[in-house]
Swiss-Prot record:
Its cofactor is FAD. This is Soluble pyridine nucleotide transhydrogenase. Keywords: Cytoplasm, FAD, Flavoprotein, NAD, NADP, Oxidoreductase. It is found in: Cytoplasm. It comes from Escherichia coli O127:H6 (strain E2348/69 / EPEC). It comes from the Bacteria. GO terms for molecular function: dihydrolipoyl dehydrogenase (NADH) activity; flavin adenine dinucleotide binding; NAD(P)+ transhydrogenase (Si-specific) activity. HAMAP family: SthA (MF_00247). The keyword Mitochondrion does not apply. The keyword Oxidoreductase applies.
Length: 466
């Protein structure tokens, strides 16, 4: 007789990956429970990561826009807002997102269980509940979607009230005048924009030789220049020797011999998977040094009945991709295989001020591959819509094959870049000759719009051909 389990599948984590898996499973008729360690669903994305940081960024960018607009600004007086004020805006967005996502589970009759899960054996979980009790749950299959957390080196005193990571920064209760940010990845650069936009002095410590080296170099250089122009001090190729927490701030000793002091430190250098409490050794699974699990194309781990999605499997570590991974894993879990798969060119959105977004190859990659490409550019300052709304800083760059006209990569720097990129992405995904830069010349755009940048860039690129 077949074994009887409490559930067909248990999903550990309610972030984008867990939500995608849970919704995919219940839509296929599976009996599903979702385990969430916190009181509210949504995971790190909703409560400490994507949603609050982007809400902060939006509030700050609107303040900057107001202060720079000659129609509204009185140059003898600037509009200012406290960190607490803009955190309130983020809290409102978080609450809306939480209620909406809670509704998804309720409407689909998906059970939510609060507590910390750990494996007892291959088909059994122990759930440590908030009241101290322990429940035993069984399932035929599992999806691990427990996300990640900021990496904490053992020699950094994170309990110190002036030393923050990208989670605890959202609980800041003082108004800093000077911030040190260690780590110039996506999170570090986004918070550098936020704090500098609030007129806070920022020292950005980069352990590498340029910002966001995975980007097209022109985009990286544009961000570096914009930071320099706004007053952010960037220190490349630096590593800390020692970090001292003081009563009035933080002192950072760098291996190069420099010493820096500021009101507080945001440590934003790396993340680690939330797998250490799952007792994975009880089911024969091991993680790498970052707490991440290896999976196959269907998101199965080394144990075929255990799947993993989202940050816990590493690249690309994007909320958008995690949801799709969960949906694909759900299909594979129920049907034995998945017909869906992640798209080849996943767009990247970086919410600095201004935004950066890209999809496809960079100039550096195409040059190394010896692909005969050409470049088409549109400067935002030449677009009527950008002039109307005062968003003159920015550019759209299209890389395309000189002979076939196929679009190979699109890169955008400027306000609304993460939205603008999807127009080009839609054309890049077309098959059978549909992916061509000539589409943008032969179609009619609304006028005036930021989308018109595609027509301008396409004409600019095609005019370079001979």
């Amino acid at each position: 007789m077949p074994h009887s389990y409490d559930y067909d599948a248990i999903v550990i984590g309610s972030g984008p990956g867990g939500e995608g898996a849970a919704m995919g499973l219940v839509k296929q008729g599976a009996r599903v429970a979702v385990i969430e360690r916190y009181q509210n669903v949504g995971g790190g994305c909703t409560h400490w990561g994507t949603i609050p940081s982007k809400a902060l960024r939006h509030a700050v960018s609107r303040i900057i826009e107001f202060n720079q607009n000659p129609l509204y600004s009185d140059h003898s007086r600037l509009l200012r807002s406290s960190f607490a004020d803009i955190l309130n805006h983020a809290d409102n967005v978080i609450n809306q997102q939480t209620r909406m996502r809670q509704g998804f589970y309720e409407r689909n009759h998906c059970e939510i269980l609060q507590g910390n899960a750990r494996f007892v054996d291959e088909h059994t979980l122990a759930l440590d509940c908030p009241d101290g009790s322990v429940e035993t749950l069984t399932a035929e299959k599992f999806v691990i979607a427990c996300g990640s957390r900021p990496y904490h080196p053992t020699d950094v005193d994170f309990p110190h009230p002036r030393i923050y990571d990208s989670d605890s920064i959202l609980s800041m209760h003082h108004e800093p005048r000077h911030v040190l940010i260690y780590g110039a990845g996506v999170i570090g650069c986004e918070y550098a924009s936020i704090f500098r936009g609030m007129d806070v002095k920022v020292d950005l410590i980069n352990t590498r030789d340029r910002l966001l080296a995975f980007l097209d170099q022109e985009m990286s250089d544009s961000l570096s220049y914009h930071f320099w122009n706004s007053g952010v001090v960037i220190r490349h190729n630096e590593e800390y020797e020692k970090i001292e927490g003081c009563d009035d701030g933080v002192i950072m000793h760098l291996k190069s011999g420099k010493k820096l002091k500021a009101d507080c430190l945001l440590y934003a250098n790396g993340r680690t998977g939330n797998t250490d409490s799952l007792a994975l050794q009880n089911i024969g699974l091991e993680t790498d040094s970052r707490g991440q699990l290896k999976v196959n194309s269907m998101y199965q781990t080394a144990q075929p009945h255990v799947y993993a999605v989202g940050d816990v499997i590493g690249y690309p570590s994007l909320a958008s991709a995690a949801y799709d991974q969960g949906r694909i894993a759900a299909q594979a879990l129920v049907k034995g295989e998945a017909t869906a798969h992640l798209i080849e060119d996943i767009p990247t959105g970086i919410y600095t001020i201004p935004e950066i977004s890209s999809v496809g190859k960079t100039e550096q990659q195409l040059t190394a591959m010896k692909v005969p490409y050409e470049v088409g550019r549109a400067q935002f300052k030449h677009l009527a819509r950008a002039q109307i709304v005062g968003m003159n800083v920015g550019t759209l760059k299209i890389l395309f094959h000189r002979e076939t006209k196929e679009i190979l990569g699109i890169h955008c720097f400027g306000e609304r870049a993460a939205e603008i990129i999807h127009i080009g992405q839609a054309i890049m995904e077309q098959k059978g000759g549909g992916n061509t830069i000539e589409y943008f010349v032969n179609t009619t755009f609304n006028y005036p719009t930021m989308a018109e940048a595609y027509r301008v860039a396409a004409l600019n690129g095609l005019n370079r051909l001979f």
